[in-house]
Amino acid sequence: MPFEQISWLQDVREYRRVAKNRKALREPGKGTDYTHERFRDAVNRVVARIHPKRMNLRVKEILPQTAAAKTFCFERVDGPLPPFRAGQYVNVMVTVEGVRTSRPYSISSAPGAQRLELTLRNKPEGFVAPYLFNTLKVGDVLETTGPAGHFYYEPLIDGEDLVFLAGGSGITPFMSMIRDAIQQQLPLKIHLLYGCRMPEDVIFKSELEMLAAHHPGLTFSPVLSEPPDGYEGLKGFLDSTLMERLVGDVKGKTFYLCGPRVMHDFCVAALKELKVPQRKIRQELYGAPEDVSQEPGWPEGLSGDMVFEVEVAEKKMILARAGEPLLNALERGGLKLPALCRSGECSACRIRLLTGKVFVPSQAKVRESDRKAGYIHSCVSYPVGNLKIRM
């Protein structure tokens, strides 16, 4: 057994042993040889290993997937890899053009693997993805958060008949889920519908075809929106007609969505046509809309290029464009905020809005308690005037 696993088990045994003495530790004169500090330290050590706030990951191997996608295989250099749920992500911290920022990337490897894999698709119009795709090499070390997110299989809630709707690089959490389900021999029926533009855009194509051929519980249906002449596979978009044709009766099925925002809007509308209950639709959204000015409710006549002043707790003034998330402007101004999902769900980047107004897309998952307390999630908040905030 590797040393890291032995050390981990020792920490778990330590925790279980001292946990039995918690009551005695609180009663003077009845304690064991353990002190409160030793108990606390043992618990904290286990928690830090299982749920690390930060990790340093070294690139061990780079696997080409398509012309525009690569899988980066990492080993952890500051401890053992923590456990995670298939479908979770890590947030990668980088400095690009002098700006310290971060982006969440789904883990594509299965839990329990000897290395952690992130599969990235190059987006020329992006900021972080092109930097990682074009500069990251074997031996480089990245700082990331520990695994996070709630986009994973819940057996007691989701049942055993699952439909995965993927688009582009949104295939990555599903690869982790599929690999995990097969390795654990879970009694699941999985329908994977994968929307791409052209045949060369299908990530993991060979592996998915092989897995579907050897596991009757998995069906794999790539759907191309811009197929070449003579293509005999599925064509078009993941609309209600195609879904019903491929998965049959939707009753009792749980639908998972991961892909571009435009795909989410399209697929959610299709699922509503099929009368799929909202509780049976699970979504994973990363990042901000590509063009927030096209979102419902955007102020009429406001250009996304309009620039506003943002005063940060009477200490600093920065400039922010209406068409970019406030978090991006704060990072560009040299301010450090914690961030995870960058889609409004986790609330890690919340700040207090003192004066001014922001636009928040309707699909952003902002907690009602934060709204009432005057907090905004900076990753999904867009200035529509001058602001004053407190971090």
Model-identified regions with their sequence ranges:
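Iron-sulfur (Fe-S) cluster-binding modules
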Residues: 1-51, 273, 278, 300, ...
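FNR/FR-type flavoprotein reductase catalytic core
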Residues: 1-17, 130-312
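Ferredoxin-reductase
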Residues: 42-141, 145, 160-161, 196-198, ...
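A short, compositionally biased
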Residues: 86-88, 301-308, 345-347, 383
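Local cysteine-cluster metal-coordination motifs and their immediate loop/turn environment
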Residues: 173, 331, 335-362, 370-385
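Phosphate-handling active-site elements
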Residues: 182-189, 356-365
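C-terminal accessory/binding modules appended to enzymatic or scaffolding proteins
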Residues: 304-345, 354
